[in-house]
C-alpha cells in the first residue's frame, strides 16, 4: 500500500465514493437525511452517481456502517464557514493596566478614568496599580482612598475582581466589565 503525502493538507476525515472499501453492506441515508435502508455498497454508489453527488461514510464503526448521499464539497465548505464564524465570535480578554500615584491631580485622574472606562467598554479587564515612593509608604490610607474612589466611580460598568491589596511598594486592584 502506497502512503500518500499530504503536503500541509489534512486528510479527509470521511471516506467518500470509491474510497469506501472492505464493506459489503451499508445503511444509507438520502440527500435530505431520510433513511433509505440497507443495501450493498455498489447499489449505494449507483444511487449517488444517479443523483450527481457523493456517497460519504458518516459512521464507519456502526454495524453496518452508515453512509449518506450528499454534495461533499458543499458539506466541507459549510463546515469550514461555520468554524470561521465561531472563531470570529471568540473574544480574547486582555488585562490593561493603568498606573496611578497617591498625588495624582484631578485632571490626570479624569483622563485615566476615561481610559479605564474605554477598556472596560471594550470588554477587557483593567488592572489599577497605585505606586508609592519613599515617604508615601507612611500614608497608604490616601492611596487606598484613591482606589476606593476609582471603584465607586466605575461601579456602574465594572465589578471588582480582586480588591485593593498591597504588593510590595504598590497597591493593586483588578476590575472586570459587568455582564450585560
Curated annotation (Swiss-Prot):
Gene3D superfamilies: Translation initiation factor 3 (IF-3), C-terminal domain, Translation initiation factor 3 (IF-3), N-terminal domain
Pfam families assigned: IF3_C, IF3_N
Chief place of localization: cytoplasm
InterPro entries according to UniProt: T_IF-3_C_sf, T_IF-3_N_sf, Translation_initiation_fac3_CS, Translation_initiation_fac_3, Translation_initiation_fac_3_C, Translation_initiation_fac_3_N
This protein's UniProt keywords: Cytoplasm, Initiation factor, Protein biosynthesis
The keyword Manganese belongs to this UniProt entry's keyword annotation: no
Subunit structure of this chain's protein: Monomer.
NCBIfam families xref list: infC
Name the UniProt record assigns to this protein: Translation initiation factor IF-3
Species of provenance: Shewanella woodyi (strain ATCC 51908 / MS32)
Gene name as annotated: infC
Amino acid at each position: 500500500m502506497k502512503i500518500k503525502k499530504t503536503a500541509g493538507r489534512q486528510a479527509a476525515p470521511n471516506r467518500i465514493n470509491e474510497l469506501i472499501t472492505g464493506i459489503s453492506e451499508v445503511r444509507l441515508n438520502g440527500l435530505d437525511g431520510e433513511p433509505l435502508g440497507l443495501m450493498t455498497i455498489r447499489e449505494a454508489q449507483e444511487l449517488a452517481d444517479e443523483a450527481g453527488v457523493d456517497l460519504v461514510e458518516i459512521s464507519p464503526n456502526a454495524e453496518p456502517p452508515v453512509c449518506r448521499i450528499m454534495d461533499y464539497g458543499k458539506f466541507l465548505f459549510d463546515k469550514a464557514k461555520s468554524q470561521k464564524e465561531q472563531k470570529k465570535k471568540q473574544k480574547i480578554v486582555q488585562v490593561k493596566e493603568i498606573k496611578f500615584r497617591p498625588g495624582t491631580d484631578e485632571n490626570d485622574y479624569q483622563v485615566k478614568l476615561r481610559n479605564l472606562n474605554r477598556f472596560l467598554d471594550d470588554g477587557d479587564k483593567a488592572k489599577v496599580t497605585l505606586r508609592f515612593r519613599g515617604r508615601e509608604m507612611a500614608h497608604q490610607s490616601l492611596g487606598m482612598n484613591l482606589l476606593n474612589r476609582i471603584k465607586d466611580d466605575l461601579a456602574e460598568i465594572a465589578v471588582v475582581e480582586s480588591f485593593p491589596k498591597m504588593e510590595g511598594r504598590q497597591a493593586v486592584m483588578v476590575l472586570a466589565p459587568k455582564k450585560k
